[in-house]
């Protein structure tokens, strides 16, 4: 009965949540997985007889180790996912929150978790069990707050991995083979995806685990924004450039997701293809707010898979393209990632959009992206800013083609 009730509630929430809020939903569900692991561990520790693990104060050693690991990882997953949810929802600042001695403190707490687990297994003290849970909740909080907004897709992937390992740990405690297998699958796939994404962003995998990447001090140019001239246009200008192009590369980002412009974009592309214009889609590995965010939206709009390319597959094509149509992709197109060592996104591979003959950038304003820094692409000679809602602008361009 409870499985049915929970399943219906989950299905209702997932059905009602718009695609733009999917990252927040994923983070929220991850927190529930972690909390469930904590509750199961507490129940097993307080009443081990109900789980055939022994008696209070005399729990089987192997079960106690599994229980402790599952509880610790579950607590880390819960508090970390809550912080990720708050950052994604805008309730908490998406900028990195750092303080002096943060990494040594994180390392000290992680070592403390190992030491306390050892003594907990030796003494089976309830006080140590509650201390273990408390500092695990704390380290989950501390691991996520220093991670910058531009890197949230990696955080979501990493928390997905944590939730899997938490489930697997509790699966061992309950001697539930299905829970062990599914938890291990989720944990390992999440870890592999995180590693692949980190390589694509030129980030260290261990920095993700310890927390704190994306926290570099901003450059002076980012902190002291000067009024620089930009060229702005309208749908007529954009349609004229596209009609006279032989190749167009579409660069979707979170702005497309917010405006739900993927279907309008597909219609525009279909019109371009009828005019014998070659069109491709360039997807950055961390575009959007979770892994594969743009791919999901384009698939929803029935965009053919053979037109969608990852960064390393299409980046060299920008230099030969006539028009790049950037629709809400901000940080992943920022050239300062290649030129400014003080930038928070320095070293992250970005799409070489500025190499196109003409760049059409659809955005509501010149406000910074999720990383909180100005985009130099706005001010390039070959960039034409289209200040409007992404969906409306795309529809207007289609009418003028």
Name these PLM-found stretches.
Residues 1, 21-33, 96-108, 153-162:
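Cytoplasmic-side transmembrane-helix entry/capping segments in multi-pass membrane proteins
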Residues 148, 162-206:
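Mobile "lid/hinge" segments at catalytic clefts and subdomain interfaces of large enzymes
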Residues 8-26, 81-96, 139-152, 194-198:
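C-terminal ends of transmembrane helices
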Residues 1-8, 63-78, 124-135:
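Structural signature of hydrophobic alpha-helical transmembrane segments
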Residues 226-401:
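Structured cytosolic domains appended to multi-pass membrane proteins
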Residues 12-23, 38-56, 123:
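Transmembrane alpha-helix boundary signature
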């Amino acid at each position: 009965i409870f499985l049915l009730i929970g399943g219906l509630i989950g299905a209702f929430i997932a059905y009602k949540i718009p695609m733009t809020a999917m990252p927040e939903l994923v983070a929220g569900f991850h927190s529930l997985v972690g909390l469930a692991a904590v509750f199961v561990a507490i129940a097993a520790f307080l009443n081990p007889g109900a789980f055939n693990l022994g008696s209070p104060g005399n729990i089987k050693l192997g079960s106690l180790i599994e229980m402790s690991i599952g509880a610790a990882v579950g607590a880390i997953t819960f508090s970390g996912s809550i912080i990720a949810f708050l950052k994604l929802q805008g309730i908490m600042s998406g900028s990195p929150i750092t303080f002096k001695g943060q990494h040594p403190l994180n390392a000290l707490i992680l070592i403390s978790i190992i030491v306390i687990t050892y003594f907990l297994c030796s003494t089976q003290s309830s006080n140590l069990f509650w201390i273990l849970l408390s500092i695990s909740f704390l380290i989950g909080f501390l691991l996520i707050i220093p991670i910058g907004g531009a890197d949230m897709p990696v955080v979501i992937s990493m928390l997905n991995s944590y939730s899997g390992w938490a489930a697997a740990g509790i699966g061992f405690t309950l001697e539930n083979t299905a829970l062990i297998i599914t938890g291990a699958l989720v944990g390992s796939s999440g870890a592999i995806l995180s590693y692949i994404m980190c390589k694509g962003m030129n980030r260290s995998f261990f920095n993700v685990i310890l927390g704190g990447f994306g926290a570099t001090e901003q450059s002076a140019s980012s902190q002291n924004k000067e009024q620089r001239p930009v060229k702005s246009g309208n749908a007529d200008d954009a349609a004229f450039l596209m009609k006279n192009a032989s190749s167009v590369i579409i660069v979707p980002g979170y702005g497309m997701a917010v405006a739900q412009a993927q279907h309008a974009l597909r219609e525009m592309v279909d019109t371009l293809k009828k005019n014998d214009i070659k069109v491709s889609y360039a997807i950055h590995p961390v575009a959007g707010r979770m892994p594969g965010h743009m791919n999901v939206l384009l698939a929803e709009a029935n965009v053919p898979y053979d037109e969608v390319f990852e960064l390393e597959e299409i980046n060299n094509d920008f230099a030969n393209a006539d028009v790049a149509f950037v629709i809400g992709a901000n940080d992943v197109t920022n050239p300062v990632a290649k030129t400014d060592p003080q930038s928070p996104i320095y070293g992250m591979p970005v799409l070489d959009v500025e190499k196109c003959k003409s760049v059409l950038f659809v955005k509501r304003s010149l406000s910074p992206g999720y990383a909180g820094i100005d985009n130099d692409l706005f001010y390039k000679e070959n960039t034409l800013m289209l200040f409007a809602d992404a969906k409306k602008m795309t529809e207007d361009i289609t009418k003028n083609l």
